[in-house]
């Protein structure tokens, strides 16, 4: 499954390595299509997530639990 999502990071979530965790924990491939983010400030990423459908859903839930709006 491949899906495009916009991730909105509040300022307190910009220092977390959540995209790395998506790769390691959920076996997802991430293609960053657009990024507007600065350390210590809010920002957004347009990404394409590719992986097994249950893992994509779990990965999105993980992001939301860590303060990222999907």
Locations of the language-model features?
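Long, contiguous binding/interaction regions
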Residues: 1-70
């Amino acid at each position: 499954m491949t899906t495009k999502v916009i991730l909105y990071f509040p300022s307190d979530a910009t220092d977390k390595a959540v995209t790395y965790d998506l790769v390691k924990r959920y076996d997802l491939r991430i293609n960053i299509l657009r990024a507007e983010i600065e350390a210590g400030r809010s920002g957004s990423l347009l990404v394409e997530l590719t992986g097994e459908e249950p893992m994509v859903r779990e990965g999105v839930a993980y992001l939301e639990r860590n303060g990222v709006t999907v």
